[in-house]
Amino acid sequence: MANLLSLHGLNPDEERCLHVGFSAGRFEFMARPYGVIPRTAVEEAAWPALRGQIFMEAAEIFLRLLRGDVINSDMIRSTVLTRANFRSDEDWEKVQDAAVEFEALSSRPDAIEIPSRYVFEDLKIIPTEFRKDLLRLVAGTHDPRAQTFVNTILPVKVFNLSITSPDVIDATHERMQEVYHPDGGQWKRGDMPRTSFVFLNDEEGLTSEEQSAAAQAEAEQALGAYWNALEGTIDPTKVNRAANNALIGNVEEVAQQMVERFHPDDRIMAWFDFFNHDSERVCRNMTAYMQRVVPLVESMLEGA
């Protein structure tokens, strides 16, 4: 990244930015090839909560090196698990019991220190001088502690899932206004794109009612597959909740949903091709969105 930005920024008038996103990865298969797996029985018991802590350890190394620091593993945050890291007493007690057995303790500990995952001597990156003003960092995490922590080092924007509830989105904006690193300037609502599935039907030969019904059917099938992939089971309640976040319908319906649900300053990241391998249809949907939905939304906002 430093090399790329050094070359990219050779032109002093260059304004195009490099946007780099990083996250822990939602699925196990993303992390396993890189050795991010439980190393002990304690880590295995704590794994759902521990993965987020590993992300913060790795993020600190990544960001401090980008900042130009000389660091070693002794300078990186330590991972200490307590009850606060777990959703229930039962989950925490399982980890405590694993620690008692693994470490031959006489009683359940109140805190469990996890050895550093990344052990290294003094390290820095070169080149040290590059156009950091052309770098935009985005963390894919919904954890408020992680969002706050990474911004103690460098300006890091955040990213939300298409199924994130409006309440969580608004709370994130409020928090980021307080914790966003000052070197990044004032936090703006557009700094966190609002991700949304778009199930738009503007197909020829259908009435507006038929387009609406077809879009609903496409959305139900796709969102059911999405939750099945995430959790291994289809939960109708969660499918309905995801549908409430998605944009579904004909041109007029999608435009109306955007105006009613979204803040006027939101930046929309529209996801068109989920569960749809018909490239021509995807392109038609994208064209209809830009040529018909967007102008309609703009006119509705102007008249509001």
Which residue stretches match the model-derived regions?
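Short acidic, glycine/serine/threonine-rich loops at helix termini
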Residues: M30-V36
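An alpha-helical appendage that flanks or caps ligand/catalytic pockets
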Residues: T40-T128, S165-R267, M300-L301
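A generic, well-ordered mixed alpha/beta core segment in the N-terminal half of proteins
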Residues: M1-F29
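Long, low-complexity C-terminal extensions of enzymes
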Residues: G249-G303
